[in-house]
Amino acid sequence: MNFYTENNGATTLENRKLLASRAFNVSSHYDSAIFNYFNQVFEEPVLKISEQNGNVLRYGENPHQKGFFYGDFDKMFTKVHGKELSYNNLLDVDAAVNLMNEFKGDNPTFAILKHNNACGLATRNTMKEAYLDALAGDPTSAFGGVLIANGKIDVATANEINQLFCEVVIAPSYDQEAIDILEEKKNRIILIQNEVELPQTTVRTCLNGVLVQDKDNVTDTKEHLKTVTTAVPTAEEIEDLLFASKICKHTKSNTIVFAKNKQLCASGTGQTSRVDALRQAIEKATSFEFDLTGAVMASDAFFPFPDCVEIANKAGITAVIQPGGSIKDE
């Protein structure tokens, strides 16, 4: 408002254009909110996105790119400590939250993500045990990662986390002493995840437009499973298959996931062939000394040929979960 006082209430054309722009921003946002409310019922094929809260990021995916975040971050998280989140931090946080949402209400579960993919995940009786077994999944990739828990982070867990360099820690709650420990690293970002509903629609740019779809909220359960082999999976194998399937759902395709005793043993991610993803997973499991005997395998798509199952069998895999659909399934 300084230009009013500085000019005795007079305005320039540029001043009025700026104020008009801000006024129409408010009114158009209000109109969009009304339309989107009614369109929940009528589902007209019209997209109206209006976000008032825009934040300038340090840069985009790379330093030479501009970056912005439009949304109400403070509604989803309470930031306790640390530096400003970067464009890449936000992508990892988004991936972490969506993955851990699959384990909401489960026993203590901890995940470590890097470049939007889980490199470690485990469910245990305590959060400390879950963290340590998640870290064991790939301690190399965990460096600089994003950590997330489905329950309170206590002092014992915080002491273990504090030995690792990580960018972000996310949990629904913390012991105060645990926060004090984690704050010892001045740049580490500590977030409390608030109890809010996650978006139910995904949007991404494509060519000169956007693609919109309903969020994939389907999680495999025992009722979804259909055994198509003579051998029937044990109760323990079924638990591991469902566990691996949740991770597989949130990993870049082509992907193969190995799990055993509710621990991510290894994964092959983002490969151009399913065989390559499988070989990568076997190599990683071997490098971190996992015994795959009795482990299970999840695939994010069907197997067009029997080679993956044959290779997995030789590696010790005893049960496989995959969506099916290959013409060679029979």
State what each model feature region is:
Residues 29-32, 36-330:
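ATP-dependent carboxylate/acyl-activation modules
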Residues 1-40:
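Internal, active-site/partner-interface "lid" segment
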